[in-house]
Structures are given as C-alpha cells and as structure tokens.
Amino acid sequence: MSGRSASPSRPARTGVVSVDLVLVTYRDRELHVYAEPVKKARGLTLPWGIPAKGDALDGVAVRIARRAMGSVPKWMEQVGAFADRSMHPAESNLSVCYAGVMPWTDSEFWREHHAVSALGERQRRMVTASLATIRTQLEQAPIAFSFLDRDFTLSELQQTYETVLARRLHKARFRRALQAAFLVEPTGNWRSEGRGRPAQLYRYAPRKRKRVRRGVRLDLL
C-alpha cells in the first residue's frame, strides 16, 4: 500500500502516525526489500498506512501487507517507532515500523536491500533496523524458513542463513545444529540440481518439546 506523495517543502504533520512495513524476501543469495515508486514524485516508499481511531497497529500492518502482496508475511514483528523531521509520504512525524518475511514472489517492486537509497531518510533507517531485528531473532524464531517455499533443500536453507547472517557456514556443523534443533523432516521427494545428484527435499516440521528453541542454535555454527 502506498499513499499520496508528500511535498518536499511541506513539514510533517504534528500528531500524525503512520505504520510502515519493511517486507523482506530472499532470492539468489540476496535479501530484497519491497519498495514502490512514489506517485507524482521521484524516489521510493515502503508500504504504509494511517491507523484509524481504535485500530490495533498489528492489524494495520496485516492490512498493509495484504494490499501490497495479497498475503500476510509468514513472520512479522514490530521493530519500533521512528520520529524525525524528514519527509515521509504520509507527512507523519512518527512512524511505527514492522518487519515481515515472506518467500519470493514475482513482483517488480522487490529491490536488493542495498539498492533502496531512493527511500526517504526515515524509511532507510527502518530498513536497517528491520534487517538487524531479523538477524538477532534468527535463533529464537523460525524466520529462515519463512523465506522459503514449503519444500526446500538443506543447501537452500543453509544459503538463507548465510545470506541473513552475511557469513559462510560450515556445512557439516550447520547440519548437525539443524538436526539437534528437530526442526525439519524429509518429504520423501527429491529435486534435480544441475549435474549433481538429486537433492532431498525437506519441510519445516518442529518437534514438540518442553523446552523448544525455534531456530538453529547459532553458537553451534
């Protein structure tokens, strides 16, 4: 969802609060952020909306996601509030930011996360904070699986972790940590990948335990 563009010379409206959504996906070892062109102006904008009186902010974020993508992110969390005097498409002086993670979809508005300099200053800070939140929550929540389709290979899962963490992981240690977390199960199907042997497909299927870690333990990597 995008709103009308703000005039560069018009100050933020006091008391106006926007909800901004940083949608993040994964493709070809890169994180991508959803950003739309600003109407009647140069630049980009994150999807945003203005809550009506009595609206729950979580619900507003869900509505924004549905309007932008037609679906709700598999994982979504409030990142924080951002306030400054910089221009915002809603002309708001305060923005509540949510981060959402979803699998890749064919949309012209996905952009590599380091190529969103055309966003306004406040929204650029939201992207930076959202990516940091995703990294810090990677161990505590099944975020990495939210980037992937229902069925995936272990190599795809490892590449997703490597992309989010921005570092290479040892294959054997990663798979031991994944096995110790009881998070995946084989589907019984295989996928051909290049000239090598077909790769086994897995799905996210966490085993119920009294003390559950919902992500792969990063200290084991």
Model-derived regions, located:
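Short proline/glycine-enriched turn/loop segments at secondary-structure junctions
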Residues: 9-10, 87-88, 189-194
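Conserved Nudix-box catalytic region and its N-terminal flanking loop in Nudix hydrolases
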Residues: 29-71, 138-153, 159
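Active-site segment of metal-dependent pyrophosphate-handling enzymes
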Residues: 15-19, 58-62, 66-107, 135-144, ...
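NUDIX/MutT-family hydrolases
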Residues: 97-100, 106-139, 147-155, 160, ...
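Short helix-coil junctions and helix-kink-helix linkers
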Residues: 159-168
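Long, intrinsically disordered, low-complexity Ser/Thr/Pro-rich regulatory/activation regions
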Residues: 186-221
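N-terminal strand-loop-strand
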Residues: 2, 6-44
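Short, well-ordered beta-strand micro-motif
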Residues: 23-25, 99-101, 201-203
